[in-house]
Amino acid sequence: MAFTASLDGAADAGARIFNNPASIRDHSEKLAILEFPQFIPPTRVARAAVDINAFIDAHGDTILKPLDGMGGSQIFRVRADDPNRNVIIETLTHEGRRTIMAQAYLPAISGGDKRVLIIGGQVIPYSLARIPKAGETRGNLAAGGRGVAMPLTEGERAIAEYLAPILWARGLLIVGLDVIGDRLTEINVTSPTCMVEITAQTGFDVPGAVIDALEKACA
């Protein structure tokens, strides 16, 4: 993130930079979803154990994750009767010194944590479902998930088409939404992946769409 500050000078001098450095800084990949509450699962951002425990008590099955993680690192599924729930909260929050996110567990994860790509304000018609391996909650490919490309569902398309013009207006040319069922869980703007897998499995030329979007933006 610090490097984006140095890119501001280049942008001020006329360089076209995608994604826009200021927009990258403004879009915390975990927190950005809070701008679109109509699409997200029940969510709480907190560091105090009492607040996190209250969320777990209210929603039961809960996902806890740090705000700066990636690849499924340090993501915990905690149930209300989990004997380790307090120590998990203490560990993730560094005993109340670090803010984390709590989200209601979505059973639709069994069908995959979907990566939906938006390129230059246009929605790619396929997602990559990252399906958890047996015994896992996390679908991330880095955590052993299996990637299966498939056409967008109506719900996924509705979310993506709503967000696409908003994010493109902010200079975000390449965006990866994470969607479970019909709920938005993250907006990735730093290094959205799954282009290779979608292209290989469907024949849809996602890299070509990126080049086309760049040429159009710079024309």
Please provide the spans of the model-predicted regions.
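Conserved N-proximal alpha/beta basic substrate-recognition cap immediately N-terminal to
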Residues: 1-47, 51
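Anion (oxyanion) recognition and catalysis
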Residues: 11-12, 57, 168
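Hydrophobic beta-strand scaffold residues
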Residues: 17, 62-63, 174
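Anionic group-transfer/hydrolysis microenvironments
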Residues: 21-22, 67, 105-106, 117, ...
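Short glycine-enriched loops at secondary-structure junctions
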Residues: 21-25, 130-132, 180-183
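Short glycine/proline- and charge-enriched loop/turn segments
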Residues: 37, 141-146, 191-193
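Phosphate-binding site of ATP-dependent enzymes
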Residues: 49-50, 57-61, 68-159
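ATP-dependent carboxylate activation and anion-phosphoryl transfer catalytic cores
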Residues: 135, 151-219
